[in-house]
Amino acid sequence: MKHLRLALAILVVAMLGGRPALAHPHFQKTIVVKLPAGAEVTLTYNTTPANEMRAAEVKVGSFVTPRRPLVKLSSELKAGALTIAAGEYTLGVIKNGDNDWTMALYPGAIERNATPDPAKVIKLDSTYSSAQGKAEHMLIDITPGAGRFEGKAVLTLHFGTMFLAAALS
């Protein structure tokens, strides 16, 4: 009986100790989209929990990038009034206020804990909403646009209740 209790205790500890690792995986995601104009856009990112408490701590004017998602453009691309050169960019957001964010790109891949040069940040013509529901983990995609982005390819970033969209064509 003593051995059975010990075996059961070890099993319970092992199950409880292993549960967080099983309950919370992160996925490497890659999305490739060929836009009607011919450019290929590749999004590469790791899912991360939508921690809005950390987002609330971001200083106004700061560029932040949860897990440093990458956007690769095969050719030059129009994004609103901007022309963005072919290449690799880190996707992020700029905090404008408590409930106001702008989607942005930063040339190249940003190393972990590096401070991006604010002068190099490319602000995209984007919309922000907190009324699109909640994403428990960060979701990034390219979808057909609606509303003011009707008829355009739209880069979207959904993080908790924060939803940003920016036209890419």
Residue ranges and their predicted role:
Residues 14-21:
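C-terminal segment of classical bacterial N-terminal signal peptides
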Residues 1-8:
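Bacterial N-terminal signal peptides that target proteins for export
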Residues 22-64, 96, 108-169:
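Primarily secretory-pathway and cell-envelope proteins
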Residues 64-113:
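Mid-length scaffold segments of soluble, non-membrane domains
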Residues 11:
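Structured alpha-helical
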